[in-house]
UniProtKB/Swiss-Prot annotation:
Pfam families per the UniProt record, alphabetical: Plug, TonB_dep_Rec_b-barrel
Secretion signal, residue range per the UniProt entry: 1-21
UniProt feature coiled coil, ranges: none
Function, as annotated: Required for utilization of free heme at low concentrations.
Organism for this UniProt entry: Haemophilus influenzae (strain ATCC 51907 / DSM 11121 / KW20 / Rd)
Ranges for domain TBDR beta-barrel: 158-723
SUPFAM superfamilies cross-referenced by the UniProt entry: Porins
Disulphide bridges: none
Membrane topology according to the record: Multi-pass membrane protein
Motif (TonB C-terminal box): 706-723
Compartment(s) where it occurs, according to its Swiss-Prot or TrEMBL record: Cell outer membrane
Gene Ontology CC terms: cell outer membrane
Name of the protein this chain belongs to: Heme/hemopexin utilization protein C
Length: 723
């Protein structure tokens, strides 16, 4: 079979020496997250298909939790889980699938809709990365790649079928997927389909999380045409649909209605009847403490809803890879569409958020003597359309619907300059972005320059140092720009008390400046012939300016009148909500990874810790994951056939919380076991069996800043048969 150099490079990088290695692969070459096909490219942290099959994770965030300072945010519902990288998550981490950005982001809902069965590998860049991907990459980048026929065909076969069935006991999750694929000298094609069905999730000690059942189904089609050795085109289409009944805030355990909030407010103010005024007037500090407790223990107002999320993406790729050092070109055209639909169970009120993204990416790399360049242009247009239902009861106080558009154009340049016989490598990069957002009545536009540089010093053949400086930014989202109407409200004394969104025309982009240094030691044949030992240590400090937060407050006039007269409208509830630049933050931490590997044995450990504080007040930041340390072992009982492993992870107590956060989080230890039967030859070479037992001792625990408990003991089994 004949494929271009790029196709072969992509395919061969997927091969791993150890099917169950949980540690980071530091030596493979990747061109997805870094956008850099040169031999000097920075190597991101990666989860291969083998490690994904072994772990049997149910979300991208779950699959990455073994990586230091990468944690799960969003609770225990898999659809709501998002990676938290060095204390930053949500729209501060860029999500990429097959080289294309995924921009859907709706507060307290999911945004990672790609099922694990359609993921071939995941790459993670930790730290600001706007010089590569533009707005949003303050915390880093999570890049996923779906499979093609070349990944799945074996031994020069021209046709194949892969069938997989998975099952997990914690929620009776059944995972079914089938792939059919074929290739010849010119063409390759893949068609995959999947269906996942889960019941309510079991947490530690046998408790059940209500309204965590779900269904997800969909498929992927890919077609490739190898025109000649230098030209290749690919067309892919992916479509998934997710269904569940859950609180509209997917991160909370149970629904929290306006009526429940109002009852708590009345009780706090000593109001026993709607027709009677409050009997107490709490101090500002008491009021602040009360409202923070409601938020941190229960979450925001959230009604039980039937939810559907259709998600689709179409991508056209063209690769030009002639035998020319100046040309290594990739062009991608794409169209993404995501719709989030909700209907309240009791009242039937409907909401809908629809985001369409169309764009083009152009990238080329050139080798000029001893200098490598990678450069490109990105353009994307986001269009959002929202619907927000109202009524006179449970949907009386709602945000207004809004429609808006956003256009972003970015140009970037990466250079690699080796010096002193490649003992020293200087890699500067820069990106310029121009963006505008507009509704029918308002338009905003701005631009931003994001520089970065990396210095690598190879001291000896077993020691090297890397120093980085990266800048990043996040432009205000369309929701932050254009949301209006009521945030929440209550009716007491026959009066409506309404908290309303207030537009902020002076909202500035968030910016980050990150400094980090890494030391990497690596030895071959250290204790015995053929063994390998690696240890890597990183320290980082990320200064983030102009954090955008939603602030709830009273204006001076309302506060004064409320203090003088408790019956004044606004005395019970703050009147205003506004997105503001209110925090200058510092995120700093360390990461340690070590691995020792022989032909059959792999020992590994990793440690990650992030501290976050407000630089102005010194107060701890919210949503910073607890420090964690993990140790593990993998051993091939039968070489090239049967491997077993175990990991023990200790999560430290998280007591560094903001002053108005009423909850701290105790420490806990989780123990996981795994085994894989995957013979490389013989009559069962087409069969792979994976078994995992997570949270072996059924610990009851709650991750830091989560509003619900984590998954209890969970036995997992997966069978894959290919022919």
């Amino acid at each position: 079979m004949r494929f271009s150099k790029l196709s072969l490079a992509i395919t061969t990088t997927l091969v791993t020496a150890n099917a169950l290695a949980q540690s980071v692969e530091l030596d493979s070459i990747n061109v997805i997250a870094t956008r850099d096909p040169s031999r000097f490219a920075y190597t991101p942290e990666k989860q291969s298909k083998d490690s994904l099959l072994s772990k049997q994770a149910t979300s991208v965030a779950d699959a990455l939790e073994d990586i230091p300072n990468v944690d799960v945010r969003g609770g225990s519902r898999s659809i709501a889980q998002k990676p938290n990288i060095r204390g930053l998550s949500d729209n501060r981490v860029v999500q990429v699938i097959d080289g294309v950005r995924q921009n859907f982001d709706l507060a307290h809902r999911g945004s990672y809709f790609l099922p694990m069965s359609l993921i071939q590998e995941i790459e993670v860049i930790k730290g600001p990365s706007s010089s590569l991907w533009g707005s949003g990459a303050l915390g880093g980048v999570v890049a996923m790649r779906t499979p093609n026929a070349l990944d799945l065909l074996k031994n020069n076969d021209k046709f194949g079928v892969k069938i997989r069935q998975g099952y997990q006991t914690a929620n009776n999750l059944s995972e079914k997927d089938v792939s059919v694929f074929a290739a010849n000298d010119k063409f390759d094609v893949l068609i995959s389909g999947f269906y996942n069905n889960a019941d309510n999730l079991r947490t530690g000690k046998g408790n059940k999380l209500n309204n965590t059942a779900y269904k997800q189904f969909g498929g992927l089609a890919k077609f490739g045409w190898q025109i000649n050795d230098a030209n290749r085109v690919e067309l892919s289409h992916r479509e998934t649909r997710f269904k569940q009944t859950a609180p509209s805030n997917n991160e909370v355990e149970n629904e929290l209605t306006n009526e429940q909030i109002t009852d708590q407010i009345k009780k706090f103010h000593g109001q026993k009847d709607d027709l009677l005024p409050p009997t107490t007037q709490p101090s500002p500090s008491e009021r602040s403490e009360f409202y923070s407790k409601v938020k941190t223990r229960l979450g925001s107002v959230s009604y039980l809803t039937d939810q559907q999320i259709p998600d689709q993406s179409t991508v056209f790729n063209y690769y030009l890879t002639p035998d020319n050092p100046y040309l290594n070109t990739h062009i991608a055209l794409y169209n993404n569409k995501t719709i989030e639909k909700e209907q309240r169970k009791v009242s039937g009120v409907k909401d809908q958020t629809k985001l369409t993204t169309r764009g083009i990416n152009l990238r080329n790399s050139s080798e000029l003597s001893h200098i490598s360049f990678v450069y490109g242009v990105d353009y994307m247009r986001d269009k959002i359309r929202t619907e927000r239902g109202t009524n006179g009861s449970d949907a009386k106080f709602r945000a207004d619907p809004y429609n808006a558009n956003s256009n972003t154009t970015g140009v970037y340049l990466i250079a690699h300059i080796p010096l002193f016989g490649e003992k020293l490598l200087v890699s500067p990069s820069v990106r310029y972005d121009h963006y505008d957002t507009s509704s029918k009545t308002v338009k905003y536009k701005d631009n931003h320059l994001s520089p970065a540089t990396k210095l690598t010093w190879i001291v000896t053949n077993w020691l090297d140092f890397t120093a980085k400086y990266n800048e990043a930014f996040r432009a205000p989202s369309m929701q932050e720009r254009f949301v209006s109407g009521a945030h929440f409200g209550a009716n007491t004394l026959g009066l409506d008390h309404i908290n309303r969104f207030v537009a902020n025309p002076n909202l500035r982009p968030e910016t980050a400046k990150n400094k980090e240094i890494t030391a990497n030691l690596h030895f071959d044949s250290l204790f015995k012939q053929g063994d390998k030992f690696k240890i890597e240590a990183t320290y980082f400090r990320n200064d983030v300016k102009d954090f955008i937060n939603l602030k709830i407050f009273n204006d001076a006039k309302t506060s004064a009148s409320a203090g003088a007269n408790p019956n004044t409208n606004g005395a019970l509830l703050p009147k205003n909500s506004q997105y503001q630049n209110i925090t200058n933050a510092r995120l700093s931490g360390i990461e340690l990874q070590a691995q020792y590997q022989t032909e059959r044995l792999t020992l590994f450990t990793n440690y990650g810790s992030t501290k976050g504080k407000d630089k102005d007040s010194g107060e701890a930041l919210s949503n910073i994951a607890a420090s964690k340390i993990g140790v593990g072992v993998n051993y091939a009982l039968v070489k090239d056939k049967f491997t077993v492993g175990a990991t023990v992870t200790h999560y430290a107590a998280q007591r560094r919380v903001p002053k108005d956060h009423s909850v701290t989080y105790p420490s806990y230890i989780l123990t996981d076991l795994r085994a894989t039967y995957a013979p490389l030859k013989g009559e069962w070479k087409n069969l792979r069996l994976d078994f995992a037992l997570e949270n072996l001792f059924d610990r009851k625990y709650q991750p830091a800043f989560s509003l619900m408990e984590g998954t209890g003991r969970n036995a997992k089994i997966s069978a894959v048969y290919s022919f």
